[in-house]
Amino acid sequence: MYEGVVQDLIDELGRLPGVGPKGAQRIAFHLLQADPADVRRLADVLLEVKAKVKFCSICFNVSQDDQCRICRDPRRDPSVLCVVEEYKDVVAIERTREFRGRYHVLGGAISPIDGVGPEQLRIRELMVRLADGTITEVILATDPNLEGEATATYLTRMLKPLELRVTRLASGLPVGGDLEYADEVTLGRAFAGRRSADD
């Protein structure tokens, strides 16, 4: 244990995802030894991100504007909608350059053990988007784990009465994995080989 604000800094850094106690300590000591101007820039950027970044009013991707660049892009196919769990999944799919439609970010996955049901996700907003008839295909690009599969199954049942083409990403993604960690080739192949969600 360190004194006062040093320990406070280590504790706060340790709350970040993927940063353990030793990593938090290394980052804290790096910041203590860094040039004050560099630390100020980091602090300013953190505050600026919290102040300026919000969620797109259409798809719920991160954006500095009311609508994200993907929703504003007239070259994107408005008839195909890719449903993902988190905004970081949008980045992973965009890296493949295989998908030219639009997105809908649910904000998580159904996980009863964590107290997350359909009501906590942006499923209501998804149904509103589908109501105008512009979208003809929905790609369910949830993580290939238990929660992702539960979410995809739930959505498939919800979407069936709408008579849309509902597809899932093809295999090739490891079960139990997260989309954001898939390499571009694997994710690209999974996109190209997607299948009907009813199969």
Curated annotation (Swiss-Prot):
CDD domains xref list: TOPRIM_recR (cd01025)
Pfam family, one: Toprim_4
Positions annotated as zinc finger (C4-type): 56-71
GO biological process, one term: DNA repair
Keyword Cell inner membrane (UniProt): no
Keywords: DNA damage, DNA recombination, DNA repair, Metal-binding, Zinc, Zinc-finger
One Gene Ontology MF term: zinc ion binding
Organism superkingdom: Bacteria
Family matches, as Gene3D superfamilies: 3.30.60.80, 3.40.1360.10, 6.10.250.240, RecR Domain 1
InterPro entries per the UniProt record, alphabetical: DNA_Rcmb_RecR, Rcmb_RecR, Rcmb_RecR_Znf, TOPRIM_dom, TOPRIM_RecR
Domain Toprim: 79-174
SMART domains: TOPRIM
UniProt xrefs under PANTHER family: RECOMBINATION PROTEIN RECR (PTHR30446:SF0)
NCBIfam families with a match to the protein in the record: recR (TIGR00615)
Similarity-based family: Belongs to the RecR family.
UniProt function note: May play a role in DNA repair. It seems to be involved in an RecBC-independent recombinational process of DNA repair. It may act with RecF and RecO.
Protein name: Recombination protein RecR
Organism, as annotated: Nocardioides sp. (strain ATCC BAA-499 / JS614)
